[in-house]
A protein has these predicted regions:
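N-terminal hydrophobic/helix-forming segments and targeting peptides
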Residues: 1-312, 316-441
């Protein structure tokens, strides 16, 4: 694992790359991300053959751009892919034509609200070609001239040059507990020259991984799986190739747009009032935040993970909306280190509670002889816990998680968990994992 001085410095390494769905620069991005992941995380890049059916979708081809520009018939260059990869519509078809302005205009894209900026436009599945430019440049184009549009692109279907995603796994103290399952943290990597959407979420996830590796979750907790790849189709392809993992996933967080100066927003799970929702709301009590419905804008891979036929409860964290979205103004200038770290902190607190939570089930009969087993809590040292002891023990029937119990008795989760652990160590309760809700059909 490479050391880093700031999350923004990591982002600066892959921000300028043309990291579209499947491309050489996307491969480089995954390699850069891997270099900063903890050495113990077994960071692995998976490759899927283009055009392979994955559920109702197909794995996309690798996209290669050799050259692309738009110029006047006199040779005056208007936009050039070499200057900025956003100048062409992502996954544009090859073209080499001389056109009138009227013929060219349907293939030109700009942002009305930000006339100085180049928009990011993609047509992954609606195959066409196009150029992106500032509205100010568009307005200056002579209407009576001819234009030369050149895009030398190809769609590679060689299985050896396939579509890639990456995963890493960080275990709790003492190693994995297979029965506890895994918690999934995702960030997508496929938006070229976009710093906040999506590079910021990637580096916040890297920071979360570092924290969980340096200060592991308690023994017996879930492992935390990190996933990096192209939005939507990346998760679909990964899950379609790894369906056996789905029942093992107990919850998830999708992270994006974490670097701008908005308050944090979280989107509920599809279940709406799931344990994961309650834990998130609990952890954000003292944080200025906004709460949103599942899959409200900006909806991303939680629609796959928590969608039909998968159903793993998943929230998302972001700082959307922001005016620079999907333009060249979404650059390093709008990224703030404290925002990146703040999002990692929020995610960490949610993960630490959810992944360490379990269901305690009693083995004892009758009230436990507390003082005889070192389980008495002196009221002079902790009045609140002393008054809650009976309530806690009455909830050891295997119907409540530790978080449920803490919520019901009105105490901090970690206070209650530490106390319940004493019962487990004495053999008075056994720990049972959070049940799987993942579907495989």
């Amino acid at each position: 694992m490479k050391a880093y001085t700031s999350l923004k410095s990591i982002l600066a390494e892959f921000f300028p790359l043309h990291r579209t769905l499947a491309s050489d620069d996307h491969d480089k991005t995954l390699e850069i991300v891997g270099s900063y992941m903890p050495d113990s995380s077994n960071y692995t890049i998976e490759t899927y053959a283009p055009l392979t059916p994955v559920w109702t979708w197909k794995v996309p081809e690798r996209y290669v751009v050799h050259e692309a520009y738009l110029e006047t018939e006199e040779g005056e260059r208007i936009v050039d892919f070499q200057d900025n990869p956003l100048h062409i519509v992502s996954y544009s078809l090859p073209v080499d034509k001389t056109l009138s302005f009227e013929e060219l205009q349907p293939h030109l894209y700009f942002n009305e609200k930000r006339p100085h900026a180049v928009p990011w436009i993609f047509k992954y599945y609606e195959r066409d070609w196009g150029f992106c430019l500032p509205r100010n440049t568009f307005d200056r184009l002579p209407r009576d001239k001819k234009y030369h549009a050149l895009i030398k692109s190809e769609f590679v279907t060689d299985p050896q040059q396939g579509f890639k995603v990456a995963t890493a796994l960080i275990h709790p103290a003492g190693g994995p507990n297979p029965g506890a399952g895994e918690f999934l943290v995702q960030a997508h990597t496929c938006h070229p020259m976009q710093a906040n959407d999506d590079g910021a979420g990637v580096v916040s996830a890297i920071e979360l991984a570092r924290r969980l590796a340096e200060s592991p979750l308690p023994a017996g907790s879930m492992s935390v799986r990190f996933w990096f790849g192209p939005e939507t189709i990346g998760t679909i392809a990964w899950l379609a190739h790894n369906e056996s993992l789905i029942p093992n996933l107990r919850g998830g967080i999708f992270m994006e747009m974490t670097g701008n100066q908005n308050r944090i927003a979280w989107h509920r799970t599809r279940q709406h009032n799931h344990l994961l929702d309650r834990i998130t709301a609990y952890q954000l009590q003292s944080v200025d935040h906004e709460e949103r419905a599942f899959a409200s804008a900006p909806a991303n891979d939680e629609r796959v993970v928590n969608g039909p036929g998968v159903n793993v409860p998943c929230i998302s964290l972001n700082r959307f909306p922001y005016d620079e979205y999907h333009t060249t103004d979404d650059n390093l200038d709008i990224i703030h280190e404290d925002m990146l770290l703040g999002a990692a902190e929020v995610a960490e607190q949610i993960v630490r509670v959810y992944a360490s939570n379990y269901i305690p089930k009693r083995t004892f009969r009758g009230p436990v002889f507390l003082s005889g087993h070192g389980l008495w809590v002196d009221w002079r040292e902790n009045w609140a816990l002393n008054r809650a002891i009976e309530k806690i023990m009455m909830r050891f029937e295997g119907e409540h998680t530790v978080f449920d119990i803490a919520e019901q008795v009105g105490l901090d989760y970690w206070t209650v968990r530490e106390y319940v652990e004493k019962f487990r160590i004495k053999g008075f309760v056994t720990s049972h994992p959070i049940p799987s809700e993942g579907q495989t059909s």
